[in-house]
């Protein structure tokens, strides 16, 4: 039966409808108060280009009746998440957004990043816009609250870890920690994450005063230091509301079919966080439709829902329904409000300013796409390169030669993909060509090895560090560096990878098999992108070489100390990677390093106390 004919038999009841394509794939999911009337409207009367395209690809349509409109909204949200239909407004890659997990169901809870939310009794906070944002939050929390980092499930009496000795963990592994005290600290972490900062500060102050009254002066001092640290962090947060309200403030940036929603999280009257989340499929949709779709997807997964959400535009007929659904999820009233004046309107303007910046960023990303397309045309590539790798060598008269690899993905630096290499074959001899050949060969040899391990199931692609191959390799230099890189690729069987060189002075691009530079039009975006990649590789190489020299200097100093052999040197350098960190270490921190004892720690401590600071 044709879809238009099938719709005539739909019930006049609330529910959800699905449009399916030729392969049975879900093209669109929607909800309706009356399934018959809503779906029939797609096949009659005037239609937008997008609806016309949807109907043209539709080979079947089905409906699911629900008991109420609110049930339809919930089902619609679940189906959009499951199928990610092409014609719906969807959060871009919403499955990959990270969350912060607090394992409150464990005897001694932990905090860490996760991308899954099983019903395991844990508390989840997010979604966050990136893993880096979660890691930064975890780092801050562990600085304020000494939670454990280990994955142990049984806590028997054993020697505490280094984190315990340096005050970064209470040490439940030792079996000496009061579970109630640890639990109380976890509650303080939850207060911090929920934005209940005034309650947190008051609670810490009360505990400090109680400890002092009970003559527990050491405990009182610990609480005093913790209270000061919390207050210092909170002092850096902007007060954006004179009251102590909790609310989210939303604004929308648009660029063609893409959108970006800014979410300002205000907790206890302070700006706690700013999230930027991407949407796709927004062309020919009003701001109200886009924001309504966003609310249903974002708050479906959100760990916390505030009592008020400020919007830049009203959502129309869906506003009341979405507010009701949010109230059910929060288990308390939620107000969706479009302020026209006053302080709340100023908050929306602040979010809109952030949205304007997001719009500029989206335009940059579009420009980067154009630059990559131009790069493919200029260099004769089959398609625009998504992953670019830049290589450079740095040394000081041949000493401590290092090589680096930097990565651009979709035209932007991806620092998490950067890699460093200590050159082995030409150690002590200044030979940049040989060093370049070695670095490129080692990088692609690792890719080959990891590919085999992944294929046999002995390594997951998530844990691999070199298996992703570039669409283009760029080396800093001229024909000599290009030949060296090409040799490294041939050695490892990757000669098919496109490789080019870019000189510094004349800004000329050289390609294998041609003696003259590749012609590039003046003001070329492609050339600008390659220059950016080359300069970033050079910067990273210089920084890496500087850090290497610093480590070597530290190793040389440790060699002068009696009782500090190779094993202890390695352990000390792992625990204290810089000279300043080692000089600032206390005797207890030094003694807590694996393989160290009190006598060796005293020797290191005395040596650096007598060494003048430069």
Swiss-Prot record:
Keywords: Cytoplasm, DNA damage, DNA excision, DNA repair, Excision nuclease, SOS response. CDD domains: GIY-YIG_UvrC_Cho. Signal peptide: none annotated. InterPro entries: GIY-YIG_endonuc, GIY-YIG_endonuc_sf, GIY-YIG_UvrC_Cho, RuvA_2-like, UVR_dom, UVR_dom_sf, UvrABC_protein_C, UvrC. Belongs to the UvrC family. PANTHER family: UVRABC SYSTEM PROTEIN C (PTHR30562:SF1), UVRC/OXIDOREDUCTASE (PTHR30562). This is UvrABC system protein C. The lineage of its organism: Bacteria, Bacillati, Bacillota, Clostridia, Thermoanaerobacterales.
């Amino acid at each position: 039966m044709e879809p238009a004919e099938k719709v005539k038999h739909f019930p006049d009841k609330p529910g959800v409808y699905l449009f399916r394509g030729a392969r049975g794939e879900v093209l669109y999911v929607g909800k309706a108060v009356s399934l018959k009337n809503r779906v029939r409207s797609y096949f009659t009367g005037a239609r937008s280009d997008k609806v016309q395209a949807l109907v043209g690809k539709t080979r079947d349509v089905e409906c699911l009746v629900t008991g109420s409109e609110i049930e339809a909204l919930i089902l619609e949200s679940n189906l959009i998440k499951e199928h990610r239909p092409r014609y719906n407004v969807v959060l871009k890659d919403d499955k990959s957004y990270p969350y912060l997990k607090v394992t409150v169901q464990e005897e001694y809870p932990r905090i860490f990043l996760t991308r899954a939310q099983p019903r395991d009794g844990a508390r989840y906070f997010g979604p966050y816009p990136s893993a880096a944002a979660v890691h930064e939050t975890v780092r801050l929390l562990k600085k304020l609250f000494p939670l454990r980092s280990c994955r142990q499930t049984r806590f028997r009496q054993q020697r505490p870890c280094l984190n315990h000795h340096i005050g970064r963990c209470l040490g439940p592994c030792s079996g000496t920690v009061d579970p109630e005290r640890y639990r109380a600290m976890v509650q303080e972490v939850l207060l911090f994450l929920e934005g209940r900062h005034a309650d947190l500060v008051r609670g810490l102050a009360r505990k400090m005063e109680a400890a002092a009254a009970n003559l527990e002066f050491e405990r009182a001092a610990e609480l005093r230091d913790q209270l000061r640290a919390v207050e210092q962090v909170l002092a850096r947060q902007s007060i954006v509301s004179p009251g102590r309200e909790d609310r989210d403030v939303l604004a929308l940036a648009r660029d063609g079919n893409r959108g970006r929603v800014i979410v300002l999280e205000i907790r206890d009257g302070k700006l706690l966080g700013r999230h930027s989340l991407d949407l796709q499929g927004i062309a020919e949709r009003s701001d109200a439709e886009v924001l309504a779709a966003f609310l249903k997807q974002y708050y479906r997964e959100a760990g916390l829902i505030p009592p008020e959400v400020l919007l830049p535009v009203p959502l129309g007929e869906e506003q009341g329904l979405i507010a009701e659904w949010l109230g059910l999820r929060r288990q308390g009233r939620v107000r969706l409000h479009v302020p026209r004046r006053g302080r709340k309107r100023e908050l929306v303007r602040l979010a809109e300013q952030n949205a304007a910046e997001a719009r500029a960023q989206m335009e940059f990303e579009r420009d980067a796409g154009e630059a990559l397309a131009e790069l493919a045309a200029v260099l004769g590539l089959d398609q625009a390169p998504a992953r670019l790798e830049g290589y450079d060598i740095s040394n000081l008269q041949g000493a401590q030669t290092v090589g680096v690899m930097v990565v651009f993905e979709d035209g932007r630096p991806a620092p998490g993909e950067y890699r460093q290499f200590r050159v082995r074959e030409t150690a002590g001899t200044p030979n940049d060509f040989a060093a370049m050949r070695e670095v490129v060969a080692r990088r692609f040899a690792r890719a080959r090895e990891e590919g085999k391990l992944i294929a046999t199931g002995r390594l997951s692609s998530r844990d691999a560090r070199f298996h992703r191959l570039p669409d283009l390799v760029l080396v800093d230099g001229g024909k000599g560096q290009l030949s060296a890189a090409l040799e490294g690729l041939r050695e490892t069987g990757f000669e098919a990878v496109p490789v080019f060189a870019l000189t510094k002075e004349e800004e000329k691009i050289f390609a294998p098999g041609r003696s003259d530079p590749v012609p590039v039009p003046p003001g070329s975006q492609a050339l600008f992108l390659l220059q950016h990649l080359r300069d970033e590789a050079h910067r990273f190489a210089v920084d890496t070489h500087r850090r290497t020299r610093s480590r070597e200097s530290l190793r040389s100093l440790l060699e002068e100390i009696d009782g500090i052999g190779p094993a202890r040197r390695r352990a000390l350098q792992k625990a204290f990677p810089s000279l300043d960190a080692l000089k600032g270490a206390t005797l207890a921190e030094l003694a807590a390093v694996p393989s160290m004892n009190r006598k060796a720690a005293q020797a290191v401590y005395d040596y650096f106390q007598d060494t003048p600071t430069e």
